[in-house]
Regions:
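Nucleotide-sugar donor-binding/catalytic module of glycosyltransferases
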Residues: 1-246
């Protein structure tokens, strides 16, 4: 597929009409030249006015598309996969529809990605005003990160930039049969194939929030499911050719 942009933001949407405004405002505020990126909203058959709100609030100068699914999938995996397949960006970045990002995320992220030919760019993030897992973000900027030394296994959330070519060539997609922590499986698989990984932790770039309303990706899990997620992740890394010391 033709590459037209440096990066594509992929936003899965389901019944977010009352919560999506901060997300769109943060997209509108991005400092990266608008000709260099696009936004792909994938609506998972919302029953409210989410699509109308997006069309009303999004800056008309932004390259954006809305993919409308006719049948709801019930999780974020299928919409994200559609976004990956439709992307025209050299990189993809995943953003949940009720979260928001710093205005410099795209600009700083793509700069370090292009500089280092990064396969993955990690961003420092906050969850409900609490910094998530500080260890990988000990240093403000890391051009070439190491999985073990930089504790990258401690944060497998998918709120990162991923090189689209790496995902497509290795058929890295979200497992649609997994309803919780699907991002951990995706993140672990991407780590298996990533040769260059960079970290941006000079500021908080991604702001995640939790709400009681229905959400595509933030669901509770049983301890049994959590165990299977970690087991699969560790097994995948052990079976790979990566020299990783699990301590």
């Amino acid at each position: 597929m033709e590459i037209k942009y440096d990066v594509s933001i992929i936003v899965p949407v389901y019944n977010r009409e009352n919560l999506i405004k901060p997300c769109i405002d943060s997209i509108n505020a991005q400092t990266l030249d608008k000709s260099r990126w696009e936004v792909i909203f994938v609506d998972d058959a919302s029953t409210d006015g989410s699509v109308e709100v997006i069309e009303k609030l999004i800056n008309e100068n932004i390259n954006y598309r809305i993919i409308k699914r006719e049948i709801p999938s019930g999780n974020a995996s299928a919409p994200r996969n559609e976004g990956i397949k439709a992307s025209l960006g050299k990189y993809v970045f995943f953003l949940d529809s009720d979260d928001y990002i710093d205005s410099k995320l795209l600009e700083n992220g793509i700069n370090i990605a292009l500089k280092n030919d990064s396969d993955i760019v990690y961003f420092k993030m906050e969850l409900n005003a609490r910094t998530v897992t500080k260890r990988p973000f000990k240093h403000p900027i890391v051009d070439k990160a190491d999985i073990e030394k930089n504790h990258l296994m401690r944060t497998l959330r998918i709120f990162k930039m991923f090189k689209t070519k790496m995902l497509r060539e290795n058929n890295i997609l979200f497992d649609v049969t997994v309803n919780v922590c699907e991002d951990m499986l995706f993140g672990a698989t991407a780590l298996l194939y990533a040769k260059n990984i960079s970290i941006l932790a000079d500021r908080d770039y991604y702001f995640a929030s939790l709400h009681d309303e229905p959400h595509l990706s933030k669901k509770k899990m049983t301890l049994e499911k959590l165990f299977h997620i970690y087991f699969y992740t560790i097994q995948s890394l052990y079976c790979s050719n990566r020299d990783i010391n699990f301590k």
